[in-house]
């Protein structure tokens, strides 16, 4: 549970940094790692939520990439099989998809 809380703190800091420094960038955060009730989880799945989707997705293409997908982990956090598959698939489709392990590493990537 501690890792999830630490990852959430990193994600909140990154989102605030994006809002302050790049307000024009469109982004979306997934609900991954959030604890919900069984009924809410069923609704999320039925409405399209997919296990392993990256924590942050920036809809901001560059000259060489379609956008940026970030899976946030702590120094000791490990990605799931589904998270690894998402990152691999997105990279193969022209996105930059990566795992970052700190606030500093994440903003450097952005």
Sequence positions of predicted segments:
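Catalytic phosphate/metal-binding cores of nucleic-acid and nucleotide-processing enzymes, i.e., regions
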Residues: 1-110
